[in-house]
């Protein structure tokens, strides 16, 4: 991923954060206080600045009740051996015939 793509992803996260804050009808000052960060840090988050600490983002997810969204981040994928050992379930190819 190049720097341009990274900035784009962070900008999108910031835009979503701002939308969720506004949906709660919170001012920047009130929301920043809930996060335990300065208004400047919140502004940086909403603008997608890369230097914001991950802890501020985790706290924002918690305040917005989106902390479960982190479960998939860096989740360990099953190894090929585990996938081979996993029980296979048969999937129906078509509906049964009607009499």
Give the ranges of each region predicted by the language model:
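A short, Lys/Arg-rich alpha-helix, primarily the initiator
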Residues: 1-23, 73
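Short, charged recognition helix plus adjacent turn
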Residues: 71-99
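Short, basic-rich loop-to-helix N-cap that marks the start of a DNA-contacting helix
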Residues: 49-62
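Short alpha-helical DNA-recognition segment
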Residues: 25-43
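Short basic helix-loop element that most often maps to the first helix and adjoining turn
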Residues: 15-30, 91-98
């Amino acid at each position: 991923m190049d720097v341009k793509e990274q900035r784009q992803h962070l900008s999108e996260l910031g835009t979503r954060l701002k939308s969720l804050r506004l949906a709660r009808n919170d001012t920047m000052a009130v929301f920043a206080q809930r996060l335990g960060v300065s208004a400047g840090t919140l502004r940086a988050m909403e603008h997608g600045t890369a230097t914001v600490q991950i802890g501020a983002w985790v706290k924002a997810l918690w305040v917005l009740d989106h902390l479960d969204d982190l479960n998939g981040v860096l989740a360990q994928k099953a190894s090929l051996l585990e996938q081979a050992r996993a029980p296979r379930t048969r999937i129906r190819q078509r509906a049964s015939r009607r009499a």
